[in-house]
Amino acid sequence: MALLLPLAVLLAACRPGHGFSGGCDTCGLRPVAYHYGGMRVVGGTEALHGSWPWIVSIQNPRFAGTGHMCGGSLITPQWVLSAAHCFGRPNYILQSRVVIGANDLTQLGQEVEVRSIRRAILHEYFNNKTMINDIALLELDRPVHCSYYIQLACVPDPSLRVSELTDCYVSGWGHMGMRSAAPTQTAEVLQEAKVHLLDLNLCNSSHWYDGVLHSHNLCAGYPQGGIDTCQGDSGGPLMCRDSSADYFWLVGVTSWGRGCGRAFRPGIYTSTQHFYNWILLQVRAAAHPTSRTWSHYMSTSSYHHGPNAVPTQPSVSDSCPFPAQKLREFFTGVQNLLQSLWGSKA
């Protein structure tokens, strides 16, 4: 039995519960970055390539330099989750492209995939003044291929206790300086920083955000400031490690803040858990007749039978560092062997 337990743990690590993944067999895993090193986002450090393999750069030629406009997270091979306020102008959508698997936006390697946007779905009740319902879905013109540098993010369903997650990070290519007036340099290399989830009531108190936050918001950063998301990080991920396994949940979408890195003004995020059903509804409604049904990509807390998703590519791009099918076969073989040995002793 001691031999079976580690195998069961590996199987569980290849398909987390409490949420959904969009194919490629798994979500929330970082094949290249098993050991997270030192923790620019404001006050952060450069991320190693592959550290956050679901983050994407949404680019528009109207923006200087690399054209980076906003971030986003790949949640299925053909859908990206981002912030609605990034797409206030229709021509931004038509002219934009999505870069997946990149780290340095000035040097896109062979592992990077680039897609056009087929459609953008902004929340129907998004308000760009109050920033309520600041969430959007982007359908890519064709699916991407999972690899060591391209993975899917896990969106938590309502059963996950997000407030109990303590190991959380933000990442993006946004401005890196603390902003009082004009923003400073935009990052070319992906930046990352560790943050704390802060109590929403505290963030909404009179000396902080003074009641302007909504129940679907998350608040993350540090009371003293210094580390924060900034302009250009919008739409990107707020990610927390699962409390019992080495995979990450996409718990928030970067929405807004007052300044960058200021005391008592932490970053404000849209809770993905709050909009879980909205996300499912939109992607189901947009499903193409030739595509897999959305239920193919679902995994909830009631899921008990192991992964049923089929990788979109051969094993060279299998997204799970421990291929689930092989593990199940090995696990079954060991179990049969032990049963045979026990039977011979009887």
UniProtKB/Swiss-Prot annotation:
Source taxon at top rank: Eukaryota
The pro-peptide lies at: 266-346
GO MF term (any one): amidase activity
Under SUPFAM superfamilies, the record lists: Trypsin-like serine proteases
Write down the Pfam families for this protein, in alphabetical order.
Trypsin (PF00089)
Q: Which cysteines are joined by disulfide bonds?
A: C24-C146, C27-C154, C70-C86, C168-C240, C203-C219, C230-C260
Signal sequence: where? 1-19
According to its UniProt record, this protein's enzyme class is hydrolase
What is this enzyme's EC? 3.4.21.10
Which residues constitute the catalytic centre? H85 (charge relay system), D134 (charge relay system), S234 (charge relay system)
The Gene Ontology biological process annotation of the record reads: acrosome reaction; proteolysis
Catalytic activity field: Preferential cleavage: Arg-|-Xaa, Lys-|-Xaa
Q: How is it modified after translation?
A: Glycosylated.
Instruction: Tell me what controls its activity.
Output: Inhibited by aprotinin, ovomucoid, soybean trypsin inhibitor, benzamidine, p-aminobenzamidine, and zinc ions. Activity also inhibited by a Kazal-type proteinase inhibitor.
Q: How does it assemble?
A: Heavy chain (catalytic) and a light chain linked by two disulfide bonds.
Q: Which family does it belong to?
A: Belongs to the peptidase S1 family.
Further comment found in the protein's record: On the 2D-gel the determined pI of this protein is: 6.4.
* Entry protein name: Acrosin
Species: Meleagris gallopavo
